[in-house]
Design a protein with these regions (language model features):
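Short gly/ser-rich loop at a beta-strand->alpha-helix junction or flexible surface loop bordering the NTP-binding
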Residues: 1-178
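Surface segments flanking catalytic/ligand-binding clefts of nucleic-acid enzymes
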Residues: 134-135, 139, 145, 149-230
Length: 230
């Protein structure tokens, strides 16, 4: 799901939906679908309610859900499958990555940027759609260019969440694995970031010394009112 939330909408729109009804019970044919091959990549992480739902081990990495998550933890997509909400995605990550990695993921979800590197086929389709004007100017996320005008893997978009949203969800999800780590990450965010570099700098300056930072209190992109003299 974290990979899904990194995909620009203009890229998703180039791909057909997945028809799960035409596949066998283990969904073995899913691995050859363009959405999986080009965008999501196997193994796909999925939540199951019983061990019998594990499916193909080469295609899926299944995680057993032992407790009902908060309402709104799943979202329908236009491509024939559901994904965990941004908040629930972060909670699932919390039990599997380090605290600093989780904090970086929270910054990206709450930031005005995403990191997405198109594969060769995706880039070709995107270039063709733009040249044929199938994708209008200023449609979807804005791709950032380097100093030479070349495309980068950084995209500008509106934030998916706020730290307040994460904290509220963590309270609702009390008892689920990863809640403590998610609370920690939300408490150590210093505001909205616009790039991975801003995230790294924020963490280096603001995290406690025993966490590898300088322990300095900061607020990202805080508005500073100027006097008439200024």
């Amino acid at each position: 799901a974290f990979n899904y939330y990194r995909i620009p909408p203009q890229v998703l729109g180039l791909y057909p939906a997945i028809s799960l009804g035409n596949m066998d019970r283990r969904c073995c044919g899913l691995g050859s679908h363009a959405v999986v091959k080009d965008l999501l990549h196997a193994p796909l992480h999925r939540l199951v309610f019983t061990r019998a739902q594990s499916g193909s081990r080469s295609l899926f990495k299944s995680h057993l859900l032992t407790q009902e998550p908060p309402p709104g933890s799943f979202r329908q997509t236009e491509h024939g499958f559901d994904v965990t909400s941004p908040e629930f995605t972060l909670l699932n990550l919390a039990a599997k990555v380090s605290r600093n990695q989780l904090l970086m993921a929270c910054y990206e979800m709450c930031g005005s940027f995403a990191v997405f590197k198109p594969c060769e086929r995706t880039q070709q389709q995107l270039d063709e759609a733009i040249s044929l004007k199938f994708i209008p100017p200023n449609c979807g996320w804005e791709r950032v260019n380097d100093t030479k005008g070349n495309d980068t893997n950084l995209w500008k978009r509106t934030p998916l969440l706020t730290a307040t949203d994460i904290t509220a969800f963590a309270k609702q999800a009390a008892g689920l694995r990863g809640v403590k780590q998610l609370h920690w990450a939300a408490e150590h965010m210093t505001g909205q970031a616009a790039s991975p570099f801003e995230v790294q700098t924020s963490m280096l300056i603001s995290l406690p010394r025993d966490e590898g930072g300088q322990g300095i209190e900061i607020a990202n992109n805080a508005r500073i009112p100027l006097s008439e003299a200024a």
